Amino acid sequence: MTIKKLAAAGICMMQAALVFSQTTFNPDEHRTVTTNRTDGRFMSTYGVAQYMLKHTKPTCAFNPTFSKKQFAAWQKRVRDAINDIMCHPTPSVKQPQPKRLSSEQKDGYRLEKWEFYPLEGCVATFAVLIPDGIKQPSPAVLCIPGSGMTMDHLTGERPIANKRNAMALNMARQGYIAVAVDNACAGDAADLEHIAGTGYDYDTSSRLLLEMGWSWLGYTSYLDKQVLEWMKQQKMIRHDRIVLSGFSLGTEPLMVLGVMDPSIYAFVYNDFLCQTQERAIVMTAPDKRGRRPFPNSIRHLIPRFWHYFNFPDIVASLAPRPVILTEGGLDRDFQLIHRAYEISGHPENVETHHYPKFASPDKRNPNTTLPEGLTRDEYFNLVNVDPPNHYFKTDLVMPWLERILKE
């Protein structure tokens, strides 16, 4: 190409850029996804994806008209679907038994650090807090942290801004054996973050797992499952009184393990409950660059998840085992959970709470549907979520645990 042609091409590109920069873009005019075609078809790939998402009907959705027999059959379908999409492997070579790395006496409890070997080429860790003088065998709680948190935050070994989030430490002080894990990509499972002094990168590893047909949740729930199996083998733990407690991100592996393993006794769900498919459909308001929000990061992606269910369906399938939900959501979704427990014959086994800001019914959004075109903040407000007060609700959980674990 001659210099003249290169110069001409450069001028054209500059002119095009100038025209684009002079275009006035008003995000509020494009909050919802629309088409101007009379046949209702979309040219935009985003529009096509949204159309497909709206027309995706989960095959394992809970039906409030289930009979008790139908409910039991539905629970099996949910379990089969979870097993299918989590893709938990069966190692071809038997792995070594977990190994205790340390044992240290603390104020009122003993802290142990263990490592285990869930896969070839893989080692992971967990911590155990054993209250002094505890009667054995005793109930135990498997504690799963939220995003950016670690096992050491849960055990109180690393400083934490809100001490109520030191879930495992607080469980041990209450007299329960507590087992704490790291989520995949965080804590001991991090890459270079501790050296570089940066926040945890969940997305890169999640992308690699997805490329191999797995997922972040499939992997982290598989690791947690190995810890759960270890707990069942310990003489100090009552195998019929194991509780799973998840904070924020940790509620996702909690749901997976709860469905997979009917022997788990009870569940602490410390996050707001939502229809994740609906969240993706309604959060469409673009930013000033014309970028629409994605409802959650890549670590939350599980291929084919929405073909089967949404979060409330999964929690409903845990009935009749005791569950407490501590941070609200729409009353619509809580009502679905309560209905599932009614069908199971044990309505007393579910306890639900809203954020204090939305504790009064007249402060909550009573609607059963949400409008499209929402920003993230607008969505949170409409589903009765108070993000600044997202923390582990010890004041609600401890009395509940005492009640359900009382002999």
Residue ranges of model-derived segments:
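N-terminal cap/lid segment of alpha/beta-hydrolase-fold proteins
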Residues: 84, 88-136
